Amino acid sequence: MPLQTFLFEIGTEELPADFVRSAITQWQGLIPPGLAAEFLQPESVEIYGTPRRLAVLIKGLPECQPDRLEEIKGPPASAAFKDGQPTPAALGFAKKQGVNPEDFEIRSTPKGDFIFVNKQLQGQASRDLLPKLALSWLKALDGRRFMRWGDGDWRFPRPIRWLVCLLDDQVLPLQIDNGSTTLVGDRLSRGHRILHPADVSLEHGQNYLAQLKTAGVVVDPQERRAMIEQQITTQAATLEGEAIIYEDLLDEVEQLVEYPTAVLGKFDQEFLSLPREVTTTVMVTHQRYFPVVDKDGRLLPHFITIANGDPSKGDIIAAGNGRVIRARLADAKFFYQADCDDSLDSYLPQLETVTFQEELGTMRDKVDRIMEMAAAIADQLGVTEQQRGEIDSTAMLCKADLVTQMVYEFPELQGIMGEKYALVSGESAAVAQGIVEHYLPRHQDDDLPQGLPGQVVGMADRLDTLVSIFGLGLLPTGSSDPFALRRAANAVINVAWAASLEINLLELLTQGCRDFVTSHPDKTSPLQALKTFFLQRLQTLLQDEQGIDYDLVNAVLGNGETNCDEAQSRLHDRLLADLQDVKERAQYLQELRDNGHLDAIYPTVNRSAKLASKGTLPTDQLDPRPVIQAPQLVQDSEKAVYQALLAIYPKAVEVQESRDYETLVNALHELAPTVAEFFDGPDSVLVMAENDELRQNRLNLLGLIRNYALILGDFGAIVKGI
């Protein structure tokens, strides 16, 4: 069977760069399975996009679907036949499927006997299927800022201007009706708006990329990206320098041009006196230029921009872009000098004019709360007097730059300018660093704060936000988190883990919620909701970022079958009171599984815990003496277990303080043979004895084993064999 090539292109006005990237990704996930659902298996599916077009090029496509046998389920057999004759329901089903009742097969299913028919279906021609599929692919695209175009109801990010629908060299019928506008699929595409403004008559789908390149359009985003990188590198080399290629910027400009041309421009040397972050922000964020540095990494008074115009007009483009950036940098220099005329702390009163959030006061109010929370964290950490002073100053000044002229004009410089202005104002390097670092991490892969002031103040800032927003009842949902509360909670945990900060999160949340209710007497405490939220974040971070098996995470978090509600509540408080311990126990359990040592203690603990759940021993009871009646120990095997537990008890108490879980695991490992004799040896005992005192005594023995293991984790959550 000959193989065909199908081309579908949508031509538009200039699309937003982020939509082009998103549309390509959407089609990559949509079109191949969509073809497979129609029993079409091409050799390749290539998705392309530029600012003015989206296209799919399908190669090696069969002329038609394969013939196939389709099994169709009908009504229940009990409703299909009566006295051996087909009922109206059966006859209706047969008519609908174009078969005779004699063709029915009765088959058993989990829901009873049903009638089935097998139909031989002839494959449809690809040319008949593709126009409908193409239209469905277009309608399936989703994104922000869709608009109506023309006078119809069609919505798309920009008006659609042309359609190409080619199967090999033949145009397939495809039509979009949008009010008074009708677009019909054709072979006519369009070239580059400047380099080749005329139509391009496409001869064959296989010639698509080559013909458009001749017309000044590089359709393949990856090819454009490679061209941009190569041209940028070449231009920077003319200065004996190197371009700083930001991946986010490269992602964007790749979708802003159809035929990229790198243009080298320059600005006045005087602007290099500005903080580097200011200059690069103006270039990268506001102008989409690539900065250039010398061999020592020093910024040069040059930039590289990617033009979508005539390469021969490079000098004109460079001059125009140079004028624009000089004006922007001149403004930035004015803002910087004006801001430096006053000390950073002089901006604090102006924070009273900035609202943090309705019902939560001003940014100055938030700073006061951050200072209180930071002081509480500092108390927990037992910092030195010097460190406390640095933390206090960082907390007080961390938001002061928000009301400076520079940050008002360039909001992305918040924190960065706070650091610069702090140094100009005579603050210590530690305080300046803390101001910029308290925003870290800004996103999942961002750096973490390295200095103690930034770590403490960053956690305090996020905890205040979490308590305040939760207090207003604005909790994140599965699809919406407008205040980035998940990211804030993740940052608190990750900063504490990375810096080994021994904070008591439960205590901090309790204090924060208490203060919130005091200042908002009409609100209820969000403490329980916050505890649940942080436990969810712990589970996600341990599994997704630390790579801990899900069942071991559940064991550490106390989500096992052997844990009662009372024990879970107490354990959850323990988790939030010691974040470092949570991570250490999870990692240790994973290590035990990986080296095979977990299997040595799992049977003993798991069997004991399951039986212990039938008893009444509290999960925090560790001392055997008050709960085991020695005179009631009848058989040698249970006496041996009791003696072993007496030996483990002091170790268990010590492990709770030392977190030396290896000692506990070794003790449980040594206990295993004794417990095996208790259960299955010649002198085994019947745990669920008829005598109440004997039964309770034996259940308490097993409960103590469970309780010792709970110091490490709830073994009832562990899945054997993973």
UniProtKB/Swiss-Prot annotation:
Cytoplasm in keyword set: yes
Keywords, in A-Z order: Aminoacyl-tRNA synthetase, ATP-binding, Cytoplasm, Ligase, Nucleotide-binding, Protein biosynthesis
UniProt GO molecular function: arginine-tRNA ligase activity; ATP binding; glycine-tRNA ligase activity
GO cellular component, one term: cytosol
Catalytic activity: tRNA(Gly) + glycine + ATP = glycyl-tRNA(Gly) + AMP + diphosphate
Top-level division of the source organism's lineage: Bacteria
UniProt EC number: 6.1.1.14
One GO process term, biological-process aspect: glycyl-tRNA aminoacylation
Major location category of this protein: cytoplasm
Nucleus as UniProt keyword: no
Location in the cell: Cytoplasm
InterPro entries to which the protein is assigned, alphabetical: DALR_anticod-bd (IPR008909), Gly-tRNA-synth_bsu (IPR015944), Gly-tRNA-synth_heterodimer (IPR006194)
Pfam families: DALR_1, tRNA_synt_2f
NCBIfam families, alphabetized: glyS
Subunit note: Tetramer of two alpha and two beta subunits.
Similarity-based family: Belongs to the class-II aminoacyl-tRNA synthetase family.
UniProt name for this protein: Glycine--tRNA ligase beta subunit
UniProt organism field: Synechocystis sp. (strain ATCC 27184 / PCC 6803 / Kazusa)
Gene name linked to the record: glyS
